[in-house]
Regions:
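C-terminal binding/interaction regions
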Residues: 1-76, 81-156
């Protein structure tokens, strides 16, 4: 493995990374995912009796990003300055994107990925009665900037 796994000590025990020696810096991350849904359910989205599932999913993603540190054991609580989640209808389902920013000692990749993941799970929850074949696919980090490891952009 080219890089040391930073969340383990020398004895192999899980640990939270000490970021106290790092300087706060502007950090951003973007993630995306896709929820495959039948055409019939896509066509019925506006009339869902539970409310607008796209808006509920968007808000759920924002809320989840802010609570990532409570969901993923070794994540730090971060002062997020931006969480933007978009859900848009595509030909075969719903495309979800997130953008998260902070000025802190560690990055926001996990927050961006959590936002997309929970938005996708919320869509599944709201539509599962109408379509048992819903598939959550391709949740990926698209881009990150800031920090010691430098910038990253996913190759497509």
């Amino acid at each position: 493995m080219p890089n040391k796994l930073s969340h383990y000590d020398r004895a192999g025990r899980a640990r939270m990374v000490d970021v106290s020696g790092k300087s706060a810096a502007k950090r951003e991350a973007e993630a995306s995912g896709f929820v495959a849904i039948s055409a019939a359910v896509l066509g019925a989205l506006p009339s869902n009796p539970k409310g607008d599932p796209l808006e509920v999913a968007r808000v759920a993603g924002i809320m989840a990003a802010k609570r990532t540190w409570e969901l993923i054991p070794m994540c730090h609580p971060l002062p997020l300055s931006l969480v933007d989640v978009e859900v848009r209808v595509c030909e075969n389902g719903l495309a979800i994107t997130s953008k998260v920013a902070t000025t802190a000692e560690t990055g926001v990749e996990m927050e961006a990925l959590t936002a997309v993941s929970v938005a996708a799970l919320t869509i599944y929850d709201m539509l599962k009665a109408a379509d048992k074949g819903i598939e959550i696919r391709e949740i990926v980090l698209e881009r990150k900037s800031g920090g010691k490891s430098g910038d990253y952009r996913r190759r497509k």
